[in-house]
Design a protein with these regions (language model features):
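Active-site residues of response regulator receiver
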Residues: 54
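C-terminal output helix
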Residues: 38, 105-118, 122, 126-127
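Acidic, metal-coordinating helix/loop segments flanking the phosphotransfer/catalytic sites
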Residues: 32-50
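Conserved phosphotransfer cores of two-component systems
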Residues: 44-46, 70-77, 95
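The feature encodes the CheY-like receiver
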Residues: 58
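Charged docking surfaces used in two-component/phosphorelay signaling
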Residues: 17-25
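Conserved acidic carboxylate
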Residues: 10, 84
């Protein structure tokens, strides 16, 4: 069985691994990027169903990656979960993502994230449906 693909873009190796384990347990296959440049390279090669995106990254910012996702037709339907320790940035970007998690991220937030992602796994051939608001 093919799995939906999640791209985890988080420079904190421990948090990246926590996301990887949680998403794998929820049924996703995962790829990890630890900086913005690598994330952009992945997005040129793969089409994930979801991107877990830290805002503060080495080389290329999460905001730049978010703009790239929204401005590229082949990427615009990817679900995006923003992670940041900056509550003001989180509020500012709330309407540009499917979900915003403010760090530190609790177990409950992580559990709720995987529950919210379950519909992604149920879509035909794991195509991410268009965002509805």
């Amino acid at each position: 069985m093919n799995e939906a693909l999640a791209l985890i873009v988080e420079d904190d190796e421990d948090l990246n691994e926590v996301f990887r384990q949680a998403l794998a347990a929820a049924g996703f296959s995962t790829e990890s990027a630890y900086d913005g440049r690598t994330a952009l390279e992945f997005l040129e090669k793969i089409s994930p169903s979801i991107v877990i995106l830290d805002l503060h990254l080495p080389f290329v910012s999460g905001e730049t990656i978010l703009k790239k996702i929204h401005s590229t037709p082949s990427l615009e339907n990817i679900r995006v979960v923003i992670t940041t320790a900056d509550a003001a940035a989180a509020e500012f970007l709330r309407d540009q993502a499917d979900l915003v998690l403010v760090k530190p991220i609790s177990y409950i937030q992580l559990r709720d994230l995987t529950k919210r992602l379950n519909p992604v796994l149920q879509t035909d051939k794991f195509k991410t449906p268009p965002r509805t608001e």
